[in-house]
A protein has these predicted regions:
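Zn-dependent metallopeptidase/amidohydrolase metal-coordination segment
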Residues: 178-231
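Midchain, well-structured core segments that form catalytic/ion-binding scaffolds
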Residues: 1-123
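A short beta-alpha structural unit
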Residues: 89-100, 114-120, 146-165, 190
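Short amphipathic alpha-helices in soluble, non-transmembrane regions
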Residues: 127-136
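Glycine/charged-rich beta-loop-alpha catalytic/anionic-binding loops adjacent to active sites
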Residues: 45-51, 175, 207-211
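Short catalytic/ligand-gating loop segments at beta-alpha or beta-beta junctions
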Residues: 1, 85-88, 152, 180-185
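Predominant activation on well-ordered alpha-helical scaffold segments within soluble catalytic domains
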Residues: 40-41, 63-74, 133, 169, ...
């Protein structure tokens, strides 16, 4: 597939978040797919010690150092929201000590974790990456530990095609389906858009988010989203 032989890519997907439920709307038209900055294999290394024998000043607690890093990044996330970047997100999906070594009476000597930032602004994502390195260095010096953040990977924010979004808006008005426009998370559409193929999406309202057993969707909402996609696809095919 290439721009030479592919007119457009249209994708239908559940929202995976709470916005459409809160707004009581069946569907949305995404404006941009969030980019991300990720540290998938980060570690903090300290020194294992007896919890009752080592005073605070003599500890090299890898877990407390990691928790401080996470807390300070969370504070930075709040600052960014206050500055007008509500589309920025921050998640620590993994944080754990070594099960073979950890104990209630042992100072943690190692902690593994992940950091995942998302957003619609490359400048903001770059700022988050740079600040992560700076904070890790500050905490390293203060707590006498070492951070090995590992590879930093990610992708830039990907705007979706304006012309296709216009068609979807027109279809929503013609069908009487109320929609909003909003950013979305990583989807197949971003791959096509980065390859130069016009891409757009329709998000369908769903209950209880995603990535959990309570995830749900009303078939009526699925039908509304499918109508938007079908009408737009047929118009493109007839050109």
């Amino acid at each position: 597939m290439s721009p030479a032989n592919t007119k457009a890519f249209l994708e239908l997907h559940i929202e995976q978040g709470p916005v459409l439920v809160a707004r009581d709307l069946p569907a949305a038209i995404p404006t941009v797919i969030r980019g991300n900055v990720r540290f998938p294999y980060a570690r903090c290394l300290g020194e294992y010690a007896h919890s009752a024998a080592v005073p605070r000043g003599g500890r090299k607690d890898a877990l407390l150092a990691t928790v401080e890093l996470v807390a300070r990044l969370d504070a930075l996330w709040q600052e960014l929201e206050a500055e007008g970047h509500p589309d920025t997100v921050f998640t620590v999906g993994k944080l754990y000590t070594d099960a073979a070594e950890h104990a209630m009476t042992k100072v943690p000597g190692a902690c593994c974790f992940t950091l995942n930032f998302g957003g619609t602004s490359k400048d903001v994502l770059d700022r988050l990456r740079d600040r992560t390195y700076a904070l890790a260095d500050e905490i390293r010096a203060a707590r006498n530990v070492t951070f090995a953040l590992g590879d930093c990977v990610g992708s830039d924010p990907t705007p979706l095609d304006d012309g296709l979004r216009d068609r979807l808006r027109t279809a929503s008005q013609a069908l009487g389906i109320p929609v909003i426009e909003m950013p979305t998370v990583g989807h197949d559409a971003s791959i096509f858009a980065r390859a130069g193929i016009p891409a757009a999406m329709v998000l369908v309202r769903n209950q209880h988010g995603s990535h959990n057993a309570a995830e749900a969707m009303e078939m009526a909402d699925f039908g509304e989203g499918a109508k938007l996609l079908a009408v737009t696809a047929l118009e493109l095919a007839e050109q």
